[in-house]
């Protein structure tokens, strides 16, 4: 067989593989509706209930990613800084609540000692 024939066969085979493969996969992949219909009724109900919440969480995540990408720093460093900031706020809140509880205990102790 000539070289031109070999090249043509390879081009046709490559085209069939490159175009036909993804087309075949797309044709056998179930749609979201078909997958949803395969769920049992409990999963369908739970999926419908949690859909809005998950959509909101995803929107919040995308918003945070946009904020992080505006920074000159890497997204990973910006995310890490935000986590550290949240952790510091949580620690401060916990220490405030511990201080309030300690002050309340001291006041209660003073009241008890003062009444005796």
UniProtKB/Swiss-Prot annotation:
InterPro entries: Cbp4
This protein's UniProt keywords: Chaperone, Coiled coil, Membrane, Mitochondrion, Mitochondrion inner membrane, Transmembrane, Transmembrane helix
Topological category with respect to the lipid bilayer: Single-pass membrane protein
Protein's GO biological process: mitochondrial respiratory chain complex III assembly
Record's keyword annotation contains Transmembrane helix: yes
PANTHER family the UniProt entry points to: ASSEMBLY FACTOR CBP4
Name of the featured protein: Assembly factor cbp4
Originating species: Aspergillus clavatus (strain ATCC 1007 / CBS 513.65 / DSM 816 / NCTC 3887 / NRRL 1 / QM 1276 / 107)
Gene designation: cbp4
């Amino acid at each position: 067989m000539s070289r031109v024939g070999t090249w043509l066969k390879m081009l046709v085979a490559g085209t069939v593989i490159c175009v036909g493969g993804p087309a075949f996969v797309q044709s056998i992949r179930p749609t979201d509706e078909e997958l949803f219909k395969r769920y049992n009724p409990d999963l369908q109900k739970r999926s419908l209930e949690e859909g809005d919440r998950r959509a909101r969480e995803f929107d919040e995540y995308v918003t945070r990613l946009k904020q992080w990408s505006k920074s000159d720093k890497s997204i990973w460093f910006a995310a890490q800084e935000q986590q550290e900031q949240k952790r510091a706020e949580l620690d401060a809140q916990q220490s405030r609540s511990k201080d309030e509880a300690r002050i309340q205990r001291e006041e209660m102790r003073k009241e008890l000692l003062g009444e005796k």
